[in-house]
Curated annotation (Swiss-Prot):
GO terms for biological process: cytoplasmic translation; ribosomal large subunit assembly. One of its GO terms (cellular component) is cytosolic large ribosomal subunit. This is Large ribosomal subunit protein uL10. It comes from Eimeria tenella (Coccidian parasite). Residues 298-307 have a biased composition (Acidic residues). GO terms for molecular function: large ribosomal subunit rRNA binding; structural constituent of ribosome. Phosphorylated. Keywords: Phosphoprotein, Ribonucleoprotein, Ribosomal protein. Pfam families: Ribosomal_60s, Ribosomal_L10, RL10P_insert. The keyword Ribosomal protein applies. InterPro entries: Ribosomal_protein_uL10 (IPR050323), Ribosomal_uL10 (IPR001790), Ribosomal_uL10-like_insert (IPR040637), Ribosomal_uL10-like_insert_sf (IPR043164), Ribosomal_uL10-like_sf (IPR043141), uL10_eukaryotes (IPR030670).
């Protein structure tokens, strides 16, 4: 039996190093209050997308240090190996992997001494508890009354605040009310990507936000380039347009001209000629409906036919 842990340790090191070599993107997760059954469900859900690897911190640090000479970028992972930590080696997009992980949170009761991850409120109304349990409510400062043989909370109250430790009275009361106020699961703390470490919040950034930020940055570069007179790719379209406007103004005010401005300059110098040339073109479409309106006049031929018929009897 004594050799089994050593054998597992020898298998763990090459497996961790192989996963690090094959997966440049890693999610560093905390696994507080996560049970083995819940962890097994996450592994099944991530099959084909990612690999979950847990282990003791000392083993993880030892394995990473052994690989530092070949992969010095792994140094960035060492400070993250603390408390109850685990790695998710991603084959799919890390944001998609995190979404799967977040779907596998389970409700859990509030245990005494546990730090509350969220605020806990008790709503007003009947509790289903008999009057003999009023001591729990009194110890917590919750006002109650007896209605139809059961305890009823008069108004909603905040029982536990986020970050505080759960007291024995609060844990007992929530247990009696059959309330499981907390949800636990793997929590993504950091993202490791080819030697760089980012906060998990980077996974919330969308493609649209990246495009908006890039467009705003390009606009700022163009504005600065134009202000200081320094050419840049972002400012080139604006600079070319402004230069063309300056050339156009120069052509209109001086004898100088170039082919692209020749017709415009002639229009400015002799607007009457262009107005006269444009008048027939504008009148032609207007004359077409008038001609179409006069078309139905041949009905007078019927009257002539009638006169000719009556003249035969004269």
């Amino acid at each position: 039996m004594g050799k089994e842990p050593a054998a597992k340790r020898r298998e763990y090191f090459p497996r961790l190093l192989q996963l690090v070599l094959e997966h440049p993107r890693v999610l560093v997760v905390s696994a507080d209050h996560v049970g083995s059954k819940q962890l097994a469900g996450i592994r099944v859900a991530l099959r084909g997308q990612a690999t979950v690897l847990m282990g003791k911190n000392t083993k993880i640090r030892t394995a990473l240090r052994q690989q530092l000479q070949q992969q010095p970028q792994l140094q960035a992972l060492l400070p993250l190996v603390r408390l109850n930590v685990g790695f998710i080696f991603c084959r799919a997009d890390p944001a998609a992997v995190r979404a799967v992980v977040q779907q596998h949170k389970v409700p859990a009761p509030a245990k005494q001494g546990v730090t509350a991850p969220t605020d806990v409120f008790i709503p007003a109304g009947p509790t289903g508890m008999d009057p003999g349990s009023t001591g729990f409510f009194q110890a917590l400062g919750i006002s109650t009354k007896i209605v139809k043989g059961q305890i009823e909370i008069q108004q909603a109250v905040q029982l536990i605040r986020r970050g505080e430790r759960v007291s024995a009275s609060a844990a007992t009361l929530l247990h009696k009310l059959s309330v499981k106020p907390f949800t636990y699961g793997l929590k993504v703390e950091h993202v490791y990507d080819n030697g760089s470490v980012y906060s998990a919040s980077v996974l919330d950034i969308t493609d649209e936000q990246i495009l908006e930020a890039f467009a705003a940055g390009a606009a700022n570069v163009a504005a600065v380039s134009r202000a200081v007179g320094l050419p840049s790719a972002a400012a080139a379209p604006h600079s070319i347009l402004e230069a063309f406007r300056n050339c156009a103004a120069l052509c209109l005010d001086t004898p100088f001209c170039f082919p692209q401005m020749q017709r415009l300059k002639e229009m400015v110098e002799n607007p009457a000629a262009f107005a006269a040339a444009a008048a027939p073109a504008a009148a032609a479409p207007a004359a077409a409906p008038a001609a179409a309106a006069k078309a139905p006049e041949p009905e007078e031929e019927e009257e002539e036919d009638g006169d000719m018929g009556f003249s035969l009897f004269d």
